[in-house]
Amino acid sequence: MVEWITKINGMVNGIVWGPIGLALLFCTGLWMTLRTGGFQFRRVGHWMRHTIGAVFTNKEVTAHTSKEDMAISQFQSMCTALAGTIGTGNIVGVATAIVSGGPGAIFWMWVMAILGMMTSFSENVLGVYYRRKNEKGEWSGGAMYYLTDGLGAKKGCKTLGKVLAVLFACFCILASFGIGNMSQINSIAGNMNAAFHTPYLVTGVALMVVTALIVLGGLKRVAAVTEKLVPIMALFYIVGAVVIVVLHAGNIPAAFRAIFRGAFNLQAAGGGTLGYGISQSLTWGFKRGAFSNEAGLGSAVMVNSSANVKEPVQQGMWGVFEIFADTIVVCTITALVILTTGVVDIESGSVLAGVQDNALVGQAFTAAFGSFGPKFIAISLLFFAYSTVLGWSHYGTKAVEYLFGQKGTRVYKVIFVGMVVVGATMKLGLAWDLSDTFNGLMMIPNLLAVLALSGTVVQITKNYLDRKVNGKDIPPMWSVFAEYQKAEEAEAAEEAEQAREAEALAELEILGGHAVNE
């Protein structure tokens, strides 16, 4: 029975994470890039100003309270989404890509990330546009909803949209227990045991208690934790990695040469027949890139749709920034750490000194920090992997809510918390392989929806740019549902009136001050 399941899983995994699935992912990103006129390139200043730049200039981006009492801030949604995507793939996954595909794999990770920015943009635009309120007054959005109300609204596609939505939700729930929970916890427990000799059970119980306190408190509590955890963990790892790269600054030019040359080297990473090198570097770069940033999987949409935001494009731009931060920043820094410290052959990517690929980054940090190196990586993986658990707890919750309603989410959360100990103390084997497949299976219905609704994404984006950039006075496209659209417009009108009153009051105070002085 186990052998049969393993064989079937291997076949399915070879499709979703093989040439067919990766080609679909690549083509979707390319198609959305073309249809939006290269938004991630032409509007780079705009989306930077309205995402990370707005954190320091716009209080609405970080505001925790508004009339949407059950919503979370845009910054919180971004941190929770990054919590779900930044994980072991940013450390171990990069090392695997380099060893298996050569340094050139990093170039193809960048390509997948750049195109994936528009896939992420599109799915988040659709997530906000098709979201709806649940019985608690929370926003619920994600691929399930734009499959049902978007794809399902097209002629003859009602049943197809519903079936794909149910399949997506089922795959998401199963993946949340594996890649979103047990495999991350297993990685944490293994690294804590190796670095600090902490027993697996102790790590599991401790993390189970912490997870229960956070996850059972709902999205607000998860977002409150990730809002603080993600910036801290990113800064901690990036600073340590940058120190290593600076110490080996003389090797940086050679590292970039190896990346670009390896991307187009016909016989890189193991030699073989003509074109083998490009095939390997491209395949591993695409695969690890997709696994790292999750663009196209539809996972992060479920938390981004819960944000306190009216504009679908605003949340879409956060999706672009999330891919930029995950792959272009964190994965690139990890790659430079590996390539500049000499733990791999910089030309071929083959491991030196008999170091296993999953310990490459630790070896690089050991070369710079001595015995503290493995401890640094253990702490980094603790942050990265555990933040993934928190992010995926919300994804699974929303999938269960779609299928069974609010009552089902309570049962799910209890099971999710219990799985933490299982992940810490058991060898996962087939369970991990299955969850990897379920993770990939989420991608298929989501990408089909993005492609089918690409025209809607283009319309919403054009509407936004016409209003915000070109200054046209036209009705906004905020929601597909008339009742939500009207409510948002009424709230926007009220906010505009309050802003005018505040401005008038400020002018009166200034005039009054002048009168007193005279």
Predicted regions mapped to residue ranges:
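Alpha-helical membrane segments and immediately flanking helix-loop junctions
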Residues: K59-I98, L126-Y129, E135-L151, I173, ...
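Helix-loop-helix module between adjacent transmembrane segments
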Residues: M32-T33, M112-G137, T148-N186, G190-I214, ...
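Membrane-interface loop-to-helix entry segments
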Residues: L24-R49, L164, F168, I185-M192, ...
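N-terminal alpha-helical transmembrane segments of multi-pass membrane transport
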Residues: M1-G84, T88, V99-A105, G116, ...
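Extracellular/periplasmic helix-exit of transmembrane alpha-helices
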Residues: E123-K136, V242-A258, L266, G270-Y276, ...
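Flexible loop linkers connecting adjacent transmembrane helices
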Residues: G38-I72, T96-I106, W110, M118-T159, ...
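Transmembrane helix-loop junctions in multi-pass membrane proteins
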Residues: W4-I5, R35-Q40, N90-V94, S176-A189, ...
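Selective recognition of specific alpha-helical transmembrane segments in multi-pass small-molecule
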Residues: L115-E123, G204-L219, V230-G250, T283, ...
